[in-house]
Amino acid sequence: MSEPSRGRWLLPAVAGGTFGAMLTALVLLVAAPQWLGPRMVREGLLADPQVLADAADALRDRQTAPLLASHRAALETPFASSWKGAEKPDVVLVEFFDYACGYCKASLPHVEQLLREDKGLRVVYREFPILGPDSVAAARVSLAASKAGRFKQYHDALYQAGRPGPQTIAAAARAANLPAAVSDSADIEAELKRNFQIASQLGASGTPTFVVGNRVLHGAVGYAELKKAIADARRKS
């Protein structure tokens, strides 16, 4: 089964999302006060279609804000050293990722560019291994590396080594100079379980999934969309 164009979707998705928000926004616009009339609504949308996108964004933010607020601390507090960027950030981008996900790898240069450009940004990485046993093995070693203060080194080394498997995971661990860390400890298993629970509650059905401010972005949305979401989160904070 081929991967979709922006991300890998394997878990049941919850109702709603961007399409649902846009549909609701369209209904609200079409059901505008009668004095506008359908012709004026249509002409307004044709003249400035961004109005519909803005309405969808506003509606989506109102719907997700309470849910994200209840998980904010858990989302933005990294496990050990599983983060990059600002020591004292003014905005946090959370990425649910899987080392075996090609779209996560494709998003890597966009995230790295944002980190280089934005000195107030922190990226928190949440292990979300949904693509099989090798993904789970890679995530466990990644969390062990995080506990040893070597997350960045292992993270970058494994992406450079290729798709996770016994050989590439071992090579990345060596490249990161990892000690003989235990990768199946209780705190590692608890972290994986917690990530899956939060992802499910947020409707994160695949990787990558990004969370920033009151936005949940599904798939490899690209540099421009991530930058816009970060700017929006900073403006509304």
Model-derived regions, located:
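Extracytoplasmic thiol/disulfide redox context detector
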Residues: 2-133, 184-201, 206, 228, ...
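Cysteine-centric redox/oxidoreductase cores and disulfide-bonded domains
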Residues: 129-207, 211-237
